[in-house]
């Protein structure tokens, strides 16, 4: 009896060792809250709204198991930069961190509103006269598969807003490369 019990225990121990534990799957970022900014993903030619003079190229990628969106902003003139955006399930908010080739880091926070993505953050020196204040960016789909990024500035903590930039992201024309 003791011999059969020992044999049974050894057999179970051996079976447990031959079946390696499967690593836990990473958390999924496939829900609709993680897809709220997916319309911005793509290779883009960027123009001032209402004009046809190309000012930048921008590559927007969905990365890290669908949990992040990375922007690479490549202006034809001036400083480039990029951002990393993602949804935080703990807060229910979207966050974007912008880092440019000029010193400084800007953090934005917000979320979807009326089919658009609205992100707001404190941006030192971003005012029309170089003053510090809030910048609110609104991303929206527009006709022709394009995306509008409309920026507004507030020097009074969001009481009033004035336009600061307005870009249209059109799908990149690879024929012109």
Please place each PLM-identified region on the residue numbering.
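Bacterial N-terminal signal peptides
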Residues: 1-12
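Hydrophobic small-molecule pocket/channel-lining residues, especially in calycin-type beta-barrels
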Residues: 16-177
